[in-house]
């Protein structure tokens, strides 16, 4: 008697070594494989799109130019003229997150942004960069950021710890927001997909008709997850720009 399908919504997030014995030797997982693939896709599109640099751009060149203008505009709008210096970092960060979100929507691919180790690592990188930029621009005066101008000095023992906790909570909120959104979407995919097979197995021919509802929900969810993939990459990038603005202008 065949075992009935069960819902294992979190099984898709388990890591395993890719590349056979070599992958196990260097601890190279399917998460790393998708990171490499995503990076190769972005670099390939940029290289192909800008190869000819035509006056009348083709589709790939237009895509690259739109991406460049979008991220550059984001940097300048949020950080100011100094934002141009941080364009390479924001551009890389945005597309690294975006590719992790998008590639995971394909069957047999892995969403590396669904692991808090990845999103947490990115968030720590952001906060370290922001702190380094603030110290580079303002030196020890950076620490005045934790005590707003005009605040009563008597409240310093209360305000300073609150501001420090608020500052240190930035990488936590950055990482959990992205991680939680990616996990939630893929768990819903798995639940609805497994539910379709459960209905077919339990109800026979009638189950095919009953499975239309969860199938329709899954198709709708794909469109929603596409939107979420872009939105979460944008949120991660714009919050990084806002933090860099605070570091540059100290307010």
Swiss-Prot record:
Annotated coiled-coil segments of the chain: none
TM helices/strands, residue ranges: 28-48, 63-80, 86-106, 115-135, 154-176, 195-215, 219-239
Chief location of this protein within or outside the cell: membrane
MF terms (GO), sorted A to Z: proton-transporting ATP synthase activity, rotational mechanism
GO cellular component, one term: proton-transporting ATP synthase complex
Membrane topology, as annotated: Multi-pass membrane protein
One Pfam family named in its UniProt record: ATP-synt_A
Location(s) in or outside the cell: Cell inner membrane
Keyword vocabulary terms for this entry: ATP synthesis, Cell inner membrane, Cell membrane, CF(0), Hydrogen ion transport, Ion transport, Membrane, Transmembrane, Transmembrane helix, Transport
Keyword Ion transport on entry: yes
The keyword Transport appears for this protein: yes
Family label: Belongs to the ATPase A chain family.
PANTHER family in alphabetical order: ATP SYNTHASE SUBUNIT A
Subunit architecture: F-type ATPases have 2 components, CF(1) - the catalytic core - and CF(0) - the membrane proton channel. CF(1) has five subunits: alpha(3), beta(3), gamma(1), delta(1), epsilon(1). CF(0) has three main subunits: a(1), b(2) and c(9-12). The alpha and beta chains form an alternating ring which encloses part of the gamma chain. CF(1) is attached to CF(0) by a central stalk formed by the gamma and epsilon chains, while a peripheral stalk is formed by the delta and b chains.
Function: Key component of the proton channel; it plays a direct role in the translocation of protons across the membrane.
Name under which the protein is recorded: ATP synthase subunit a
Organism of provenance: Granulibacter bethesdensis (strain ATCC BAA-1260 / CGDNIH1)
Gene: atpB
